[in-house]
Amino acid sequence: MIKRILLLLIFVSTISCGYETKLSKKNENNYNFSLEEMVFEGDRVINLKIKEKLNNYRLNKEAKNFTLKIKSTNSKVVTGKNLKGDPTNFKNIATLYVNVLVENNVKNTLKFKTSFNYYNNKNKFDLKKYEKNIKRNLAETMANELIFKLANIQ
């Protein structure tokens, strides 16, 4: 009984304190920047996910207006092998290089790097689907970081 009451008190106190995630739809309006143009180069899956996340800021006309030149890379590294020499562990590393331009002058150069470790799967079809999902998740993480950085550029 005490555990239930304690759990209820913790639940009520966290709801009533006004916690919001920093990238919620409600806070999206607080970011006072807009994107004139985005130029992509590199990995297609990563670029599509980042473009999807940044399109919300394209039509806004704010005081801070940026042009982005984005280059993305993705690599898969074998981190572990069994006695036969077959790979057992992998590491997927996604890197994003962003040049932030204001009136055709480079204002900032940003670099984001995320990685994810995972085990090999005997079913190669499932492994490819899993790797594509990992790539999308890494891209979404980097896109959220990029949005936060762009909002804080002076």
Spans of features found by a protein language model:
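Bacterial Sec signal peptide processing site at the extreme N-terminus
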Residues: 14-34
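N-terminal secretory signal peptides
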Residues: 38-63
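Short, well-ordered alpha-helical segments
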Residues: 129-154
